[in-house]
């Protein structure tokens, strides 16, 4: 906006959100609420577990900074599958954000069906599933932003509850402001980070 101020328009209401903006961005970028660039943001649901290894449920321990790990998953009772709406079935590119407890809160991974040998997977109630609108934003770009110190250093402040039971509410996730560059720029940023990361790993 003018004079270095940022405004948000919802319907006819215009609000000054300058104090929410963590840093300046180039003119071709936009600050947007996560909910405006996603088709689905929702906590998973509490599963009914089963020893039958058919439908894995993604818990916080499956989401590591090293990546998504299906090996740590437990399984839901196959008979409970009809209680899951279709949108709750994880899709390629879904971001899975750990939303409960100190030490795990804020950790994120990207769901990849190629790493899941089973037919499908769902998330448990400690994981928030974020489904980006792929025409506008890359999952990998959002992942790198949320993994950055900019977000991770303040994530506990944005959560509620006692120290041991910190909770990142769905409302907080939906309202999170994200700096979005043009699509081609997102692609270049992702490629650059991948290159640097692979060099660092040597």
Model segments located where?
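Sequence-specific dsDNA recognition surfaces
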Residues: 10-20, 35-48, 61-97, 112
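Non-catalytic DNA-recognition/assembly elements of restriction-modification systems
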Residues: 15-44, 175, 183-191, 196-202
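Short, conserved charged micro-motifs
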Residues: 136-140, 187
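Glutamine-centric residue-chemistry signal
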Residues: 60, 152, 165, 186-187
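Short, ligand-facing micro-motifs at secondary-structure edges
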Residues: 64-76, 95-123, 139-144, 153-159
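A short glycine-rich beta-alpha junction/loop motif
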Residues: 119-128, 155, 160-180
């Amino acid at each position: 906006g003018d004079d270095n101020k940022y405004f948000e328009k919802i319907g006819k209401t215009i609000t000054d959100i300058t104090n929410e903006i963590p840093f300046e961005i180039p003119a071709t970028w936009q600050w947007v609420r996560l909910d405006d660039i996603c088709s689905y943001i929702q906590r998973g649901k509490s599963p009914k577990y089963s020893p039958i290894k058919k439908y894995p449920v993604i818990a916080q321990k499956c989401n590591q900074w090293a990546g998504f790990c299906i090996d740590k998953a437990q399984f839901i009772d196959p008979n409970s599958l009809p209680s899951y709406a279709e949108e709750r079935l994880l899709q390629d590119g879904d971001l899975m954000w750990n939303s409960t407890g100190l030490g795990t809160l804020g950790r994120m991974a990207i769901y990849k069906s190629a790493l899941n040998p089973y037919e499908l997977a769902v998330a448990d109630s400690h994981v928030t599933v974020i489904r980006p609108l792929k025409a506008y934003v890359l999952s990998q770009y959002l992942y790198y932003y949320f993994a950055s110190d900019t977000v991770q250093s303040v994530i506990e402040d944005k959560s509620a509850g006692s120290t041991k039971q910190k909770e990142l509410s769905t409302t907080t996730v939906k309202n999170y402001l994200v700096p979005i560059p043009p699509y081609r720029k997102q692609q270049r940023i992702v490629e650059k980070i991948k290159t640097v990361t692979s060099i660092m790993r040597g």
